[in-house]
Swiss-Prot record:
Coiled-coil region(s): none
Region spans: Zinc finger-like: 270-295
Record's function text: Component of the coat protein complex II (COPII) which promotes the formation of transport vesicles from the endoplasmic reticulum (ER). The coat has two main functions, the physical deformation of the endoplasmic reticulum membrane into vesicles and the selection of cargo molecules.
Protein name: Protein transport protein SEC24
Organism placement in taxonomy: Eukaryota, Fungi, Dikarya, Ascomycota, Pezizomycotina
Domain of life where this protein originates: Eukaryota
Keywords, alphabetical: Cytoplasm, Cytoplasmic vesicle, Endoplasmic reticulum, ER-Golgi transport, Golgi apparatus, Membrane, Metal-binding, Protein transport, Transport, Zinc
Subcellular location field: Cytoplasm; Cytoplasmic vesicle, COPII-coated vesicle membrane; Endoplasmic reticulum membrane; Golgi apparatus membrane
């Protein structure tokens, strides 16, 4: 199946050679008949024969994938035959003319390109989809343009538009149909989390061009509702949230995710609401004017809109990027600049206290920066770097230019922490291009300068103030690398961890900032266009709760490495790899984000790491590429249009000194029908919204309040659905739409997450760091962080762990639900939440498996804990390593991230604390005061029926 991402991520195994049946039309069927070759009789296909690690002691083929359908039970129907189990949504497979359940893919032979995930054509869902358009479709569109004299000889030389077909999102047909499912009898399957959101079905000719890219892809902007209620009262009645999840960048580098760029600086905007021209406007008056799709005002089309100034010739309007693509980037003219574009500035604040030096942090950080100098964006040769060292004093470094023959880096020490002055400010920020050799020499010597430092003090707060003062004339990034609690000077913090408070109602106080300095200083930095990123490494209490305020209000991020020590190769490699990618990432500077919408809609609340400068303007001194943002939408007036639009614009300076505006336009149909609203709700976007809401609640009112919010929300949704759409009667079941079937499991995962769960064992630093991730991770990574991935490796299908012949991407085994019921004692499993990976070795794993994967014959010799899997010369080891690596691959998930998860080897009969930690990721099991999935569903049924 060439499905959502065409790369094996969350895919089912492709068809084996020799099979000619079509792909089953339902994911569950594909899932239940995934491997045509019986265990132990795998066809060779020119590769080494697959080993059966359980065969020596147990029935062949019994294991995790059997539960999921990875290996068929002997005597099962051949691949492609109708499945015995109900199809997705709990309904029998229907004839082709009937609409299939939400999420079903069209039946098609393997190798045939599938519809792109996201807003694909609704062909598989509706009988009317793809039918010849009725009069008034394409013909009407063309006739309309002819009536406007937009033929080849029209004034201005605008050629006549001749669309070949309707765009995929503008087919005729009803909105998504509602498919109720019984959550108790047809439980959630983890593979459903890989399905695209319900399709956005717009009326014919909603966009001005027939481009397939006219509407925004969900990887950039996704709505919790893909059909919008026309009234506030209907939205309120639904109990569903209406919000946008916005991730303007899908990769760390433009090359990995290019978007069309409008270079000619002709930017047409609405005079009243300031929206940018987009595929959903309409043209009037022979194409000389356009009507805004947000506020309905008629605007003049700029004279240069149909003219190429560089080539001095007229151009085809209908080829312009902004009329064909929902996501475009405009090169901004002079009026979009308050001052000349700022250069990229990094000021590194090194903790050089005893804790930092002894853990190897200083040496590793200096070495990584030195090795990454070529990767720091510097295309315009204006990038500047500065360096400060911090213990109980401030150490400034003046790095000379390479042309200074006798130039030596000089260190200046300042001990006055209350009003730290800047010695020779002009020499502290040096151009990378002009001082490259001197910077390398300095970074080589830096660890030696402090190798015998016994100072335990850290005046990081004072250092931050000095750093802000130093770079605020230009703006830029303060990069903090700290292994100790700031204990002297401004923002001094004390050890406040109190184990007696953990797990109590007072625990929330430990998650709030201990000093007002950190928020007020962060807001000041934001005004100065200074962003702060924190890399925190302490093995002791570090007050992540206070320090994380600095990135939270300045568009930065907090990275936490508990118990980090460079003496462990895995620790050193993880940080060096992540820091290297961090330094090479392209970022936006001096950025602001604003969302505009159709009249009647208003952006009411904003969530994410930024400072809200006015009611609807989010300010980012630096705009990262690995975070997402949530905006709540209010319906202030009744909506009278069939389609509403929301347009996100990010004005920023690129690393290369170019001012640009990235514009993302999302169009959604409206409805007066509650069933349409539920049938078009996006469970991943809803979960993301409530994650941000729960984090806000945890930081403001405490963890109990956050968990109560989630419990109440899911109960309200189930009760509303029962009362309004299930006829008030459910019998003994629990009805919910099939497209929201994963919501209870996701909410349970969130309530049991390390950031939110009730426990007296979780240090507050660990919780605070988890809350930072919960409120910033892009949707695919957040879903995995809340509901981790579980793969059975000992019996994975033959094609797993090797490249797909068509896409060349490694194929992953089918994911399993997070329950210990999926485990067998001789199994090998990978549990991966995107931040940490656990390789679980069963207590009865056979020697051959241990030899092939770990190169040890006896399980007791297996080293548990942080590890790097050895490269061994056998087929199975190679496949296991490929699966581990592929599971870490962010690009295939359509996101940018620097995270490289640690790999822990866990023996079922080994280190108890490590085993318990891995088991906390099994969301559907009962653990640490948390309900199992079965208990959770039972309690929800009681609440809903009471």
């Amino acid at each position: 199946m060439s499905g959502a991402s065409n790369d094996g991520y969350g895919q089912y195994p492709p068809q084996q050679p020799g099979d000619h049946q079509q792909q089953p039309p339902y994911p569950d069927q594909a899932y239940d008949n995934a491997a045509p070759v019986a265990p132990g009789h795998a066809a060779d296909h020119g590769r080494k024969k697959k080993r059966q690690y359980a065969a020596s002691a147990f029935d062949v083929g019994v294991g995790g994938n059997v539960v999921a359908g990875g290996q068929p039970i002997p005597g099962a129907a051949p691949y492609g035959a109708p499945a015995a189990v109900p199809a997705y949504g709990g309904y029998p497979a229907q004839p082709e003319v009937q609409p299939a359940a939400y999420g079903a893919q069209p039946a098609q032979p393997y190798g045939q390109p599938a519809a792109v995930s996201g807003y694909q054509a609704p062909d598989p869902y509706y009988p009317s989809a793809g039918a010849v358009p009725a009069p008034g479709g394409v013909a009407g569109l063309t006739a309309g343009f002819q009536g406007m004299n937009l033929g080849a000889g029209a004034p201005g030389g605008i050629p006549q538009q001749q669309p070949q077909q309707l765009p995929p999102q503008a087919r005729a047909g009803p909105l998504n149909q509602l498919y109720p499912t019984d959550l108790l009898n047809q439980p959630f399957n983890v593979s459903e989390l890989d399905l695209p959101p319900p399709p956005i079905i717009l009326p014919p000719n909603a966009s001005v061009t027939p481009s397939p890219d006219a509407n925004c892809l969900p990887k950039y902007v996704r709505s919790t509702l893909n059909a919008v209620p026309t009234t506030h009262s209907l939205l309120k009645k639904s109990k569903l949230p209406f919000s946008l999840v916005i991730q303007p960048y899908a990769a760390l580098h433009d090359l990995d995710d290019p978007v069309p760029v409008v270079q000619d600086q002709v930017i047409s905007r609405c005079r009243r609401c300031r929206s940018y021209i987009n595929p959903f406007v309409t043209f009037l008056d022979h194409g000389h004017r356009w009507r805004c799709n947000m506020c309905n005002l008629t605007n003049d089309v700029p004279q240069a809109f149909d003219w190429d100034a560089a080539a001095q010739k007229s151009v085809d309007r209908w080829q312009r990027h902004e009329l064909n693509h929902a996501v475009v980037e405009f090169v901004a003219p002079q009026e979009y600049m308050v001052r000349p574009p700022q250069p990229l500035v990094y000021l590194f604040l090194f903790d050089v206290s005893y804790a930092s030096v002894s853990s190897g942090l200083l040496a590793t950080a200096a070495r990584t920066i030195e090795a990454s100098l070529d990767r720091i964006p510097n295309a315009d040769r204006r990038t500047r770097l500065g360096f400060m060292a911090v213990d109980s004093s401030l150490h400034y470094f003046s790095v000379p230019k390479d042309t200074d023959e006798n130039g030596e880096t000089s260190m200046l020490v300042v001990s006055d922490l209350d009003e730290p002055f800047l010695p020779v400010p002009g020499e502290l920020l040096v151009p990378l291009t002009e001082s490259r050799r001197s910077i390398e020499n300095f970074l080589t010597k830096l660890p030696k300068m402090f190798e015998h430092n016994q100072d335990n003090g850290s005046c990081m707060g004072s250092a931050l103030r000095a750093g802000d003062k130093l770079i605020s004339p230009l703006g830029g990034k303060l990069v903090v690398l700290s292994a100790s609690l700031p204990n002297v000077g401004h923002g001094k913090l004390t050890m406040r961890e109190d184990k007696k408070l953990l797990g109590t109602s007072k625990e929330g106080s430990l998650l709030q900032t201990a000093a007002t300095f950190y928020k007020s200083f962060a807001v000041e930095c934001s005004k100065n266009q200074v962003s702060i990123d924190m890399f925190l490494f302490s093995s002791q209490y570090q007050d992540v709760a206070s320090l994380s305020n600095l990135p939270r209000y300045t568009g930065g991020q907090t990275w936490f490495y508990p118990g980090w020590n460079a003496g462990r190769a895995e620790d050193a490699i993880k940080f060096a790899s992540e820091f290297r990618d961090y330094l090479s990432s392209e970022i936006g500077l001096e950025a602001v984000l604003r969302v505009r919408a159709t009249t009647g809609l208003r952006m009411s609340t904003f969530y994410g790491n930024f400072f809200t400068r006015s009611s609807d303007l989010c300010a980012f001194p630096a705009f990262p590429r690995d975070q997402c943002y949530v905006v709540e939408v209010a319906i202030d007036e009744n909506l009278t249009k069939d389609v509403v639009c929301m347009q996100t614009a990010v004005l920023h300076t690129t690393c290369n000194g170019e001012r640009r505006i990235r514009v993302m336009t999302l169009a959604l149909p409206t409805t007066t029908n509650l069933a349409d609203v539920y049938a078009s709700a996006d469970q991943a976007a809803i979960t993301t919204y409530y994650t941000h809401k729960a984090v806000e609640r945890a930081l403001g009112s405490g963890l109990d309040s956050a968990r109560d919010l989630l419990q109440k929300t899911i109960t309200d949704l189930l009760q509303t659905f029962k009362k309004e759409l299930a006829g008030g009667s459910m019998g003994g079941g629990l009805q919910f739409p099939s497209n929201l079937r994963g919501l209870p499991a996701l909410f349970l995962g969130l309530m049991k997450h390390v950031g939110l769960r009730k426990s007296a064992q979780i240090p507050s630093d660990l919780r605070s760091a988890a809350l930072c991730l919960l409120s910033t991770l892009p949707v695919p990574l957040l879903m995995q962080y809340i509901y981790p991935r579980l793969y059975s490796l000992h019996d994975m299908p033959d094609n797993a762990g090797i490249p797909d012949p068509e896409t060349s991407q490694i194929v992953l085994p089918p994911p399993l639900n997070l329950s210990s019921e999926k485990f067998v004692p001789y199994g090998l499993y990978l549990i991966d939440d995107g931040q940490t990976q656990f390789l679980w070795v069963g207590r009865e794993a056979v020697p051959q498996l241990l030899v092939d994967v770990f190169d040890v014959a006896d399980r007791t010799q297996l080293q548990v804990g942080k590890a790097t899997l050895k490269e061994l010369d056998n087929d199975f080891n190679e496949r296991v390593r490929a699966v581990i690596q592929k599971s870490r691959d962010h690009k295939s998930k359509g996101v940018g991230s620097i995270i490289v998860p640690h790999l822990y080897i866990v023996r079922e009969d080994g280190e108890p604390s490590l085993k318990l930690w891995a088991q906390t990721l099994l969301v559907e099991d009962r653990a640490d005061q948390g309900l199992s999935y079965v208990q959770w569903m039972g309690s929800l049924r009681e609440k809903v029926s009471s």
